[in-house]
């Protein structure tokens, strides 16, 4: 992990098109501003983790559900 020290209103660049700026600090909290192209998704780590967990759950459709759906479609087409 690269660790950088920045003061308020100082930035770092990631590639050519992502800029992260220290907007402010309050106690142990740091406020960051992020400029990035609209096609780049930006999430807090805990939100990103939750999205990944939900995607895994959604992709695990049981075979039983698929069998029931297949049966229903076959009955409909008769």
From Swiss-Prot:
GO terms for biological process: bacterial-type flagellum organization; mRNA catabolic process; negative regulation of translational initiation; regulation of bacterial-type flagellum assembly; regulation of carbohydrate metabolic process. It is found in: Cytoplasm. Keywords: Bacterial flagellum biogenesis, Cytoplasm, Repressor, RNA-binding, Translation regulation. GO terms for cellular component: cytosol. GO terms for molecular function: mRNA 5'-UTR binding. Belongs to the CsrA/RsmA family. Homodimer; the beta-strands of each monomer intercalate to form a hydrophobic core, while the alpha-helices form wings that extend away from the core. A translational regulator that binds mRNA to regulate translation initiation and/or mRNA stability. Usually binds in the 5'-UTR at or near the Shine-Dalgarno sequence preventing ribosome-binding, thus repressing translation. Its main target seems to be the major flagellin gene, while its function is anatagonized by FliW. This is Translational regulator CsrA. It comes from Natranaerobius thermophilus (strain ATCC BAA-1301 / DSM 18059 / JW/NM-WN-LF). The lineage of its organism: Bacteria, Bacillati, Bacillota, Clostridia, Natranaerobiales.
